[in-house]
C-alpha cells in the first residue's frame, strides 16, 4: 500500500497527496449519566471548536487494543516490584488472567490541514504527488523537507492549537503515535499492535522523508472485494482483504448516508457517535469535514432556494400538487439560511461520517456490519457500504490524506451545532492512569479496564478519600476488602474497625500480604487506648475532650463542658492518665473552699464508665498498643452500640444504656487512633477504613474527626475510606463535597434520588434509570476523582484465599466471588448488559492465536516471581 505521508516531524504530516496536516490527541468530555445542563455546556464547547476549524479537517476516534502487559505495566507504575513481591505476583497473575481477552479503550484525535497549503497552485500539488509516485515506484526515498518549511508549519500549527484549545483540551501527538495509527489501520482484527515507546522512530528524525519510517508499516496487500477463495464470501463484496505478514484479515467501511430531518439535543435522536459503543464491537469512526465560509454558503443556498421554488411551478398541472419532500427541502433551506444569517461567523460544514470494523472471519464481519445498521435504522439513520469504494474509504480514515471522491456521495450539510449534537469527543475514560485493576467498565460496549490508584487524588488537586454506599449485600464491603488487599500489596498501610461478631475483617487479615495486627476490644483486653498516652501535643487534648464529652453527654457550651475542658487542660500539662481527669473533677467538686457542682456531677458519671468492663480500654493501666503493622484491625465483636435512629434523635439518645454510650465513645476513640496511625508517616500512604460509617458520623465529634481526616489527608499522604448503606448516612454538607472517588452500589427505590445527588448527577435520567432497574451484586456507578462517571463490575482479588475471605455471603459452599453476575475468568462482554433501545449484539468470535509481546515489565516480573 502506498504510504500516506512523505515526511513526518512531530505532530506534522507532509501528505503524499499534497499539503501539510497537524494532528492532536483530544481529551474527551464526560458524557455518560451527565445532566442536561452539563451536556448543553459540552455542546456549546464542541460547537465553538467546529466553528474554528480550517477548511479541511478530520475528527477521528479509534478503539485501541489493550494488551495484558500494558495493564500490568500500569499496575506496576510507581511500585518497587523487588520490594513488594506480592504485588509483582499480582501483576503476573493479572497478565495470565487477561491473556486471550479482547480489551479496548478509545483514543480521540483531531487532524487539520494547515490553511496555507490550500492556497498553493493546484498544479504544483499535483506535480508533487506525481513525482512522489515515481520515486516510490523506483524504490527511492522521497525528498526531504527543509528546516525553514518545518519551522513555518510548526508556527502555523501552534497558532491553530491556541485557538482550538479554548474549546477542547489538545495535546500534540508524537511521530511514534502517527506511525502506530498508520500501522494498526492495516492490522485491525488480527495481530493489532499496541501503542508503546517502541513506535518511536528508530533513528533521530532529520525530517528527510518518511519513506524509511512508514514503508514497513504499510507493507501489506489490500484487495478490494477480496478473492474468490475467501471463506464465506458474500455476494456483494463490500469489504477489503488485507494480507500483512502471515495473516489475513477483513475490514469493511460504512458511511452515514441519511440522517433524521429533525432531532433535538440531548436525548432526541442525536448523539449518534456515542451510540456506536452500544453495538458491542470495536468501531473506529472518523468525520471528514469541509468548512464552507458563511458568505459562500449563503450564496449557494440562495441558488438552491431559487431552483426549488422554480420546481413548484412545474407541478401546477398536477392534481396532487408538489410532493411533500419538495416543501420539506424548501423549509430546510429556509432554516439553514436563517441560521447562517443570524450567526455570520458560523460556517456550513460538509461532513462525511465513516465507520470501520475488522475481523479475521468474514462471516463475523458481515454480522457486525448488520448489527450497526440494525442499531441506527429505526432512528432514521441510513448506513451504507459503498461497493467499490472500500479501499478509498480505508485511505480516507488515515490522518494526512485527502477526502476520497466516494465520500462526496454521502456528504451531510450541517451547521456546527448540528454536528456538535452528534457528540464527537464525548465518552471520557474512567478511573486513574495507574494503580490496581478495579474491574471492567460495562457501559461502553467493549470491555475496558478500570484502574484505581488510592494515592492519585492529590496529584490532580483532589483528596484521596473515598466513599461507597450500597444496600445490604450489594458488594460495597467486598470492594473495600479488595481495596485493602491491593493497597497493602503495593506498600501502603490500612487501619480498620471490625464490629462483626464473626470477625470478617479479622478473617480477611490472615490473607493480606505483609504483617497484620488484630487488636481485640473487650473487657479482658490488655491493650490501652488512653488518649493522653497515645497522642501528643494539641491532639491529645482534642481527642480526650471528644471522648469524655461523648461519655458525659455534655456540650462544650454548658457549665459541665467548661468544667471538663478545664480539667483536661490542667491534667494534660503533665504526663498523666485519663483516670487523672476524673480524680481532678472529684477534687474540684468536693473542694471545701469553692466546690464545683458541675465537676461533681461529671465525676460521678465518668466514674461509672471507668468501672465498666470495656472502659478499661481507655482508663486501664496497660501499655499503649504498638500500631506499626501493615494491616491493623480493631475488633469489637461485643461492643454495645445504638442504632442510627437512636443516635440522631435527641429524645432517644437520652435513653441510651451506659454500655451503648461507652461503645459509641470507644468507636470515636479508635477512629482517632486510626487517623493518627495513618497520618504518622507522610512517606507511606495510609488509609483509615470505616465500614458502616454511620456509627461514627452520627455524632458531631465523629463528623468533625472524619472531616479533619479528609481535609488533612492530602498533606499527610493519607485517606479516609467510608462505607454505609444509605447515602444520607454521610450527610449532605462539606464532608460529601470534599470526597474524591465515589461509588454507588445497588440502592432501594427510596434511596435513588439521594444516591444520584451523592454522585453529583442529580437530575440525570440515565443514572436514575440504571439504579431503578437495579444493579447486580458487585456492580456500581463509579465517579472518579476527575468527575467522570461510569458503570463498573468490580473483579475479585487475584488471590484465591483473599477472594474467599472477602465474600461474606452466607452459603454452604465457598463462592468464587461476590460478583455473581460476572464470569471472573473473563472481562464483562457487551452481551452482559441490555441497555434500552440497543441492537442485538453478534456473538464475539473466539480470539485467534496471539503473539506474546516481551516488555521491560515482563523481564522484571520474570526476575522477581520466576518464569511465566
Mark where each language-model region is.
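Surface-exposed, low-hydrophobicity interaction/linker segments
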Residues: 75-81, 261-345
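N-terminal-proximal low-complexity accessory segments that begin disordered
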Residues: 1-67
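An aromatic-glycine-centered, glycine-rich loop/turn in mixed alpha/beta architecture
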Residues: 1-6, 20, 37-45, 53-55, ...
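Short glycine-/polar-rich loops that comprise or flank the Walker A/P-loop
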Residues: 54-57, 106, 491-492, 514-516, ...
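Conserved P-loop NTPase motor cores
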Residues: 448, 454-474, 478-486, 495-504, ...
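P-loop NTPase motor core of the ASCE superfamily
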Residues: 97-98, 466, 537-583, 730-852, ...
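P-loop NTPase motor domains
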Residues: 39-54, 277, 297, 395-449, ...
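Extended, compositionally biased
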Residues: 54-118
Amino acid at each position: 500500500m502506498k504510504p500516506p505521508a512523505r515526511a513526518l516531524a512531530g505532530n506534522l504530516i507532509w501528505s503524499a497527496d499534497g499539503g501539510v496536516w497537524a494532528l492532536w490527541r483530544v481529551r474527551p468530555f464526560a458524557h455518560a449519566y451527565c445532566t442536561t445542563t452539563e451536556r448543553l455546556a459540552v455542546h456549546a464547547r464542541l460547537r465553538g471548536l467546529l466553528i474554528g476549524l480550517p477548511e479541511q479537517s478530520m475528527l477521528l476516534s479509534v478503539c485501541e487494543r489493550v494488551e495484558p502487559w500494558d495493564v500490568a505495566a500500569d499496575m506496576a507504575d510507581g511500585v518497587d516490584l523487588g520490594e513488594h513481591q506480592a504485588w509483582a505476583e499480582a501483576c503476573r497473575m493479572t497478565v495470565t488472567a487477561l491473556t486471550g481477552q479482547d480489551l479496548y479503550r478509545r483514543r480521540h484525535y483531531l487532524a487539520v490541514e494547515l490553511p496555507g497549503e490550500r492556497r498553493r497552485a493546484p498544479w504544483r500539488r499535483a506535480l508533487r504527488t506525481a513525482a512522489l509516485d515515481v520515486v516510490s515506484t523506483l524504490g527511492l526515498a522521497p525528498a526531504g523537507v527543509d528546516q525553514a518549511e518545518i519551522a513555518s508549519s510548526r508556527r502555523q500549527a501552534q497558532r491553530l492549537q491556541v485557538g482550538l484549545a479554548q474549546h477542547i483540551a489538545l495535546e500534540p501527538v508524537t511521530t511514534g503515535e502517527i506511525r502506530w495509527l498508520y500501522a494498526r489501520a492495516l492490522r485491525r482484527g488480527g495481530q493489532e499492535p499496541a501503542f508503546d515507546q517502541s513506535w518511536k522512530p528508530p533513528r533521530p528524525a532529520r525530517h528527510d522523508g518518511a519513506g524509511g519510517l512508514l514503508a514497513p508499516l504499510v507493507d501489506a496487500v489490500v484487495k478490494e472485494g477480496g478473492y474468490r477463495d475467501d471463506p464465506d464470501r458474500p455476494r456483494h463484496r463490500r469489504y477489503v482483504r488485507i494480507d500483512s505478514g502471515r495473516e489475513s484479515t477483513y475490514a469493511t467501511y460504512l458511511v452515514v448516508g441519511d440522517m433524521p430531518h429533525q432531532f433535538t439535543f440531548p436525548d432526541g435522536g442525536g448523539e449518534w457517535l456515542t451510540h456506536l459503543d452500544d453495538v458491542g464491537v470495536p468501531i473506529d469512526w472518523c468525520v471528514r469535514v469541509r468548512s464552507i465560509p458563511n458568505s459562500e454558503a449563503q450564496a449557494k443556498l440562495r441558488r438552491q432556494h431559487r431552483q426549488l421554488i422554480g420546481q413548484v411551478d412545474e407541478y401546477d398541472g398536477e392534481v396532487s400538487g408538489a410532493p411533500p419532500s419538495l416543501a420539506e427541502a424548501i423549509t430546510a433551506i429556509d432554516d439553514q439560511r436563517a441560521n447562517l444569517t443570524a450567526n455570520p461567523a458560523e460556517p456550513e460544514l460538509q461532513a462525511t461520517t465513516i465507520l470501520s470494523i475488522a475481523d479475521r472471519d468474514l462471516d463475523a464481519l458481515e454480522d457486525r456490519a448488520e448489527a450497526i445498521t440494525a442499531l441506527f435504522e429505526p432512528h432514521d439513520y441510513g448506513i451504507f457500504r459503498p461497493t467499490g469504494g472500500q479501499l478509498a474509504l480505508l485511505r480516507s480514515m488515515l490522518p494526512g490524506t485527502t477526502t476520497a471522491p466516494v465520500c462526496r456521495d454521502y456528504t451531510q450539510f450541517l451547521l456546527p451545532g448540528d454536528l456538535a449534537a452528534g457528540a464527537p469527543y464525548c465518552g471520557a475514560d474512567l478511573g486513574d492512569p495507574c494503580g490496581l485493576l478495579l474491574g471492567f467498565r460495562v457501559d461502553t460496549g467493549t470491555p475496558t479496564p478500570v484502574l484505581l490508584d488510592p494515592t492519585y487524588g492529590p496529584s490532580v488537586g483532589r483528596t484521596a478519600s473515598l466513599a461507597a454506599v450500597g444496600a445490604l449485600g450489594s458488594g460495597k464491603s467486598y470492594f473495600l476488602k479488595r481495596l485493602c488487599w491491593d493497597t497493602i500489596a503495593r506498600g501502603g498501610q490500612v487501619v480498620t474497625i471490625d464490629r462483626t461478631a464473626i470477625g470478617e475483617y479479622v478473617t480477611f487479615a490472615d490473607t493480606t500480604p505483609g504483617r497484620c495486627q488484630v487488636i481485640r476490644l473487650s473487657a479482658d483486653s490488655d491493650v490501652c487506648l488512653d488518649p493522653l498516652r497515645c497522642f501528643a501535643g494539641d491532639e491529645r487534648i482534642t481527642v480526650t475532650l471528644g471522648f469524655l464529652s461523648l461519655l458525659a453527654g455534655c456540650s462544650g457550651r454548658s457549665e459541665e463542658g467548661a468544667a471538663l475542658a478545664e480539667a483536661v487542660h490542667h491534667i494534660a500539662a503533665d504526663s498523666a492518665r485519663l483516670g487523672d481527669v476524673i480524680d481532678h473533677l472529684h477534687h474540684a467538686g468536693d473542694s471545701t473552699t469553692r466546690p464545683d457542682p458541675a465537676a461533681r456531677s461529671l465525676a460521678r458519671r465518668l466514674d461509672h464508665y471507668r468501672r465498666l468492663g470495656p472502659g478499661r480500654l481507655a482508663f486501664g493501666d496497660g501499655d499503649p498498643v504498638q500500631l506499626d503493622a501493615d494491616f491493623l484491625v480493631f475488633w469489637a465483636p461485643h461492643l454495645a452500640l445504638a442504632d442510627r435512629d437512636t443516635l440522631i434523635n435527641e429524645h432517644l439518645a437520652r435513653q441510651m444504656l451506659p454500655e451503648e454510650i461507652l461503645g459509641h465513645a470507644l468507636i470515636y476513640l479508635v477512629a482517632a487512633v486510626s487517623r493518627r496511625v495513618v497520618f504518622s508517616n507522610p512517606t507511606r500512604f495510609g488509609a483509615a477504613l470505616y465500614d458502616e460509617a454511620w456509627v461514627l458520623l452520627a455524632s458531631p465529634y465523629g463528623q468533625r474527626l472524619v472531616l479533619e481526616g479528609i481535609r488533612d489527608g492530602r498533606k499527610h499522604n493519607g485517606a479516609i475510606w467510608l462505607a454505609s448503606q444509605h447515602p444520607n448516612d454521610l450527610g449532605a454538607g462539606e464532608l460529601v463535597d470534599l470526597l474524591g472517588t465515589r461509588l454507588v452500589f445497588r440502592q432501594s427505590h427510596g434511596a435513588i434520588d439521594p444516591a444520584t445527588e451523592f454522585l453529583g448527577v442529580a437530575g440525570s435520567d440515565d443514572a436514575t434509570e440504571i439504579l431503578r432497574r437495579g444493579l447486580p451484586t458487585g456492580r456500581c456507578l463509579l465517579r472518579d476523582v476527575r468527575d467522570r462517571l461510569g458503570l463498573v463490575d468490580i473483579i475479585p482479588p487475584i488471590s484465591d484465599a483473599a477472594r474467599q475471605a472477602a465474600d461474606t455471603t452466607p452459603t454452604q459452599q465457598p463462592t468464587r466471588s461476590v460478583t455473581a453476575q460476572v464470569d471472573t475468568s473473563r472481562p464483562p462482554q457487551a452481551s452482559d448488559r441490555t441497555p434500552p433501545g440497543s441492537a442485538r449484539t453478534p456473538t464475539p468470535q473466539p480470539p485467534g492465536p496471539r503473539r506474546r509481546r516481551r516488555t521491560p515489565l515482563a523481564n522484571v516480573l520474570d526476575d522477581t516471581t520466576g518464569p511465566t
